[in-house]
Swiss-Prot record:
The lineage of its organism: Bacteria, Pseudomonadati, Pseudomonadota, Alphaproteobacteria, Hyphomicrobiales. PANTHER family: GRPE PROTEIN, GRPE PROTEIN HOMOLOG, MITOCHONDRIAL. Its main location: cytoplasm. It is found in: Cytoplasm. InterPro entries: GrpE (IPR000740), GrpE_coiled_coil (IPR013805), GrpE_head (IPR009012). One of its GO terms (molecular function) is protein-folding chaperone binding. Participates actively in the response to hyperosmotic and heat shock by preventing the aggregation of stress-denatured proteins, in association with DnaK and GrpE. It is the nucleotide exchange factor for DnaK and may function as a thermosensor. Unfolded proteins bind initially to DnaJ; upon interaction with the DnaJ-bound protein, DnaK hydrolyzes its bound ATP, resulting in the formation of a stable complex. GrpE releases ADP from DnaK; ATP binding to DnaK triggers the release of the substrate protein, thus completing the reaction cycle. It comes from Mesorhizobium japonicum (strain LMG 29417 / CECT 9101 / MAFF 303099). This is Protein GrpE. Residues 1-26, 191-210 are annotated as: Disordered. Homodimer.
Length: 210
């Protein structure tokens, strides 16, 4: 092969090598951009999956709480109505004069005992369904659980101490079915300062009255 032919072929081979290098570089750049794009999409998918998982967990917790509340408070309205019946039974018993109770009439005594047993059985049934009695005599007055009816001058106990329960209250779970109606001490020594009281249970009766 002549020197002239070699000289003509050399530039062609150099140009081809340069073009091939450019194609390779372009391919690498394209692959890198695709990799960056895929990594970004992967991060977005991971973030979306985490959000969905968090939403599902929140939904599970809300559902569990709703089911628990439904089971706990399903009888709340019925229990409140039954408390009114229990109050009437107790008023009927309290209205019977002592001499009448002490009389020797067997039939009358049996009637009194029947009414008393009925009231106790009703309260026992409510207690089995989560209803608890609030009898706060001697405790510090708490508006979350108690309703003050009057004040009693009593220097022997701290002010705002419950000294008399006019009507017991009742709660179910963390809710107050009916606050205890009480009389509180007035004029005694002040109760020592305490830590801030956490919000109490929902007072359904107070909200209903409002």
């Amino acid at each position: 092969m002549s020197d002239q032919a070699k000289d003509e072929r050399a530039p062609s081979e150099a140009e081809a090598a340069e073009a091939n290098a450019e194609r390779t570089e372009g391919s690498i750049d394209g692959d890198y951009e695709a990799l960056v794009r895929l990594l970004k999409e992967n991060e977005e998918l991971k973030d979306r999956a985490l959000r969905v998982a968090a939403e599902m967990e929140n939904l599970r917790r809300r559902t569990a709480r709703d089911v628990h509340d439904a089971r706990t408070y399903a009888v709340a309205n019925f229990a409140r109505d039954m408390l009114s019946v229990s109050d009437n039974l107790r008023r009927a018993l309290d209205a019977i004069p002592a001499e009448a109770k002490a009389s020797g009439d067997a039939g009358f005594k049996a009637l009194i005992e029947g009414v008393d047993l009925t009231e106790r059985a009703m309260l026992s049934a409510l207690e089995r369904h989560g209803v608890k009695k609030l009898a706060p005599e001697g405790e510090k007055f708490d508006p979350n659980f108690h309703q003050a009816m009057f004040e009693v001058p009593n220097p022997d106990v701290p002010a705002n101490t419950v000294v008399q329960v006019v009507q017991p209250g009742y709660s179910i779970g963390e809710r107050v079915l009916r606050p205890a109606m009480v009389g509180v001490a007035k004029g005694g020594p002040k109760i020592a300062a305490e830590a801030p009281v956490e919000p109490g249970p929902v007072n359904e009766q107070a909200e209903k009255d409002a």
